[in-house]
């Protein structure tokens, strides 16, 4: 089992910056405003030859019982319980605060190894603050700058005695189909604010891992959690709610939206979560269109279904709306769920697995050729300026999503309506519901184009 370290401390001392530094990529949102991190976030860290699991936490900050702030602290306490050691981070430039002293006592009571990290130690003011931190009684401070990467050598030396050595890694090799099938399916859950995304994931996990609240915008980072459901692994990203651009006012919310968009691009299947009490709005269409443009498989989950009084015909009406407004993902799976009550979870997970399979599908060449001949025989391409367009052949270039190249005589003259006909026919023939289908046009070279005409 991996050695686990939790990063703790008061808000805005640079915990998320240190987390990003150790995992080697910008996974956690970072901003000067305190309280950016709300949920605990895990990542695989590497420092030299040391490998360990790192947990970023919300800043330790008291609050009334049951409040969002208090529940953020509960998340931090859970992270401390899971950890084998702690990084206690202070802001050396700001010097010690009463909150630092209070939470140093909190760290001592955890009865686990604690490394005191004096962050932002660059410059004279930083050095003075680091010296002041001896008063916390947590040992010698390690002076670092998480933003600039300073002090990582000293941190490595301090960690060597704590983190157990890992076995030598096997030689890297190209991933096989079997290994790819064994990997967790990457799933992003997106939607308007307060649609119930975090509630659904908490039900899947069986614990309140992600903070939930009636207040829209509780989730800020894209939090990744790994689950196993009926023997299949999933890596699920909970994301911040996506509002219309005109409603995105705060700088932090803009960062959160950008983080959610990155999660969509990293995912393989995207679940668009909708509130059953607020039927399709323009923003839902925009989000679905974004998912299609990014080439991800789509599943629509209609949440809070337990609150609906009149249910008959609702899904059929929604299906009609989706197929009308989003023909580019015609046939997308639509599942009614209740994240709070756990209703419809099996159907949702099955829809994710099936959509992932469709997204990875390759059409056999012989079947593709038969379909192509029948499609153009049933509906030949139109004539343009009195000249018939010639479609030569089609080939699949890749999956994820299914993508094809169509060789033809005049690529610029083929109408978009005829391309839509081919895509819809292909989607129906090869059962490709809810996944983007790409057809790229390419002109077949004319072997006589380079020859000059004979003079008359």
Curated annotation (Swiss-Prot):
GTP 2 binds at residues 191-198, 238-242, 303-306. Residues 361-445 form the KH-like domain. InterPro entries: G_ENGA (IPR031166), GTP-bd (IPR006073), GTPase_Der (IPR016484), KH_dom-like (IPR032859), KH_dom-like_a/b (IPR015946), P-loop_NTPase (IPR027417), Small_GTP-bd (IPR005225). Residues 3-167, 185-360 form the EngA-type G domain. GTP 1 binds at residues 9-16, 56-60, 119-122. Belongs to the TRAFAC class TrmE-Era-EngA-EngB-Septin-like GTPase superfamily. EngA (Der) GTPase family. Associates with the 50S ribosomal subunit. This is GTPase Der. It comes from Bradyrhizobium sp. (strain BTAi1 / ATCC BAA-1182). The gene is der.
